[in-house]
């Protein structure tokens, strides 16, 4: 489906924002609040909420903005043929 291409779009948007000196945060959790968000933004019933994204300037002093999560090695979750 078309929405499956959104990941590449979001990544490209985020890279371009970074190049322009902006920080971003993609937030898939918005999709779990489809009804509330749809009411707030007055979207059509057939629209699907995939995710949200924050864009702006991060506060480097805020501890949450310096969190680095643990990553599994790529060979544990991907196979390249």
Regions from the PLM with identified roles:
Residues 1-40:
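Small-aliphatic-rich amphipathic alpha-helix that forms the alpha element of a beta-alpha
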Residues 45-81:
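C-terminal helix-cap and adjacent tail motif
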């Amino acid at each position: 489906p078309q929405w499956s291409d959104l990941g590449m779009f979001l990544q490209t948007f985020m890279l371009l924002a970074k190049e322009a000196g902006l920080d971003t945060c993609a937030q898939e959790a918005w999709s779990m609040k489809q009804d509330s968000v749809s009411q707030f933004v007055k979207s059509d019933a057939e629209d699907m909420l995939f995710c949200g994204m924050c864009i702006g300037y991060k506060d480097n002093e805020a501890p949450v903005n310096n969190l680095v999560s643990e990553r599994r090695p790529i060979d544990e979750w991907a196979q390249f043929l």
